[in-house]
């Protein structure tokens, strides 16, 4: 009986060992500028990072190969690469891009594989993406600020100046509703990718065809508006529909301030 158990156990162990040898290590947790598939990075030379998963103990990365392309199909075939670096190194953090010049507002795709000390390579990682943001004022050419109608002085409520005695039934008329903007856009051709960049002096919410875009709150981040204005990026490729589309923006009711306390 003991011999039969040993004979049954041996093929089981052998099959487990054979499975380990077939797929020993792979790459996971790919990040570009510390983010997964970022929509807008603020540099033309991004940094890449990844982790290596191994079924065996003590695995050490001895080298890597990283590739970047502007089209995922070209990247999968290893064609029209913007960057293809193969190096003997155990570094897997902050690998700086050193390929052809990237362009603001464009999306790119990348993948990586690693090797062990014997020169054996892992399978290629999943293809990930990143997009370069709008880095300077010239990238905003064609965009313009939009604003609510000018508020007449007779309807302006000035803090500290409105302490008049008010009795029940008296009213004060003012334009205190939330400023809202609406714009219709017609899509007449197939759209592969659509990105919206929105900036505002204060907070805003963006709507497309009646639905709020994204799950963010209090966009954009606060800053000193005399020096810098932040913006938010949204991928609306799936929300944009053929034919007519309606964009809406609702701003916060309070006036923006250039000094943050």
Model-derived features with residue positions:
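Sec/Tat signal peptide C-region and signal peptidase I cleavage site
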Residues: 17-21
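Accessory beta-strand-rich segments of carbohydrate-active enzymes
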Residues: 50, 88-98, 107-111, 116-118, ...
